[in-house]
C-alpha cells in the first residue's frame, strides 16, 4: 500500500490502487471546490479568509454551493453519464453539509483535489464517496460551449 493509501485509507475507504491515479502533486493554493470550478489559484470555501463568490451566501449549505456553481453556468439535475457536450461537477455532502466536489473529464472519468493534497483521476464518483466526503448529493451540468470564467 502506498504512503497515500496509508494516509487516506480510513478517510476514503472506497479509493483503491485500482480505481484512481495521481495527476498533480500536493498544493495548498486551491481545494476541491476550486479545482471542480477550474481554478488553481484560490481556495474556495464560504468561510472568512477564503475566496467565495460575492453574490453567494457565506454558508456551508448545499444551496450556497449550488448558487456558487450557478454563477459559473451550472445547473442541478445532470446525469453522471458522459455527455460530450456537457461539463459536469458532482457535489458530495455529509447530510446536507457540502464536503467535496469532483469534475467529470472528457473521457467520462472524474478528477478530484484531495484537500491540500494531490489531484487524482478516479474511475467513478463512488471512488471518493463513503468516507469523510459523504455521498454524491447533486450532479451539475453546463454546456461546454457556454463556460463563464470563475
Which residues make up each language-model segment?
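Short, charge-rich amphipathic segments
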Residues: 1-2, 36
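Cysteine-nucleophile protease catalytic domains, especially the papain-like/related folds used
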Residues: 14-68
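...with weaker cross-activation on analogous glycine-rich loops/strands in unrelated enzymes
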Residues: 58-117
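Ribonuclease/tRNase effector modules and their secretory precursors
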Residues: 3-12, 20-21, 130
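Aromatic- and glycine-rich peptidoglycan recognition patches
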Residues: 104-150
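Domain-length accessory/inserted modules outside core catalytic folds
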Residues: 26, 42, 50, 62, ...
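Generic structural signal for residues positioned in beta-strands
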Residues: 31-35, 89, 109, 138
Amino acid at each position: 500500500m502506498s504512503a497515500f493509501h496509508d494516509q487516506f485509507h480510513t478517510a476514503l475507504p472506497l479509493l483503491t490502487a485500482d480505481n484512481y491515479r495521481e495527476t498533480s502533486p500536493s498544493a495548498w493554493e486551491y481545494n476541491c471546490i476550486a479545482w471542480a470550478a477550474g481554478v488553481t489559484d484560490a481556495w474556495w470555501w464560504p468561510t472568512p479568509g477564503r475566496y467565495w463568490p460575492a453574490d453567494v451566501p457565506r454558508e456551508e449549505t448545499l444551496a450556497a454551493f449550488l448558487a456558487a456553481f450557478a454563477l459559473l453556468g451550472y445547473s442541478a439535475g445532470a446525469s453522471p453519464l458522459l455527455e460530450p457536450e456537457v461539463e459536469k461537477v458532482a457535489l458530495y455532502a455529509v447530510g446536507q453539509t457540502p464536503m467535496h466536489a469532483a469534475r467529470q473529464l472528457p473521457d467520462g472519468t472524474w478528477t478530484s483535489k484531495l484537500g491540500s493534497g494531490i489531484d487524482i483521476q478516479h474511475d467513478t464518483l463512488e471512488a471518493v464517496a463513503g468516507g469523510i466526503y459523504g455521498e454524491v448529493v447533486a450532479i451539475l451540468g453546463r454546456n461546454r460551449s457556454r463556460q463563464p470564467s470563475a
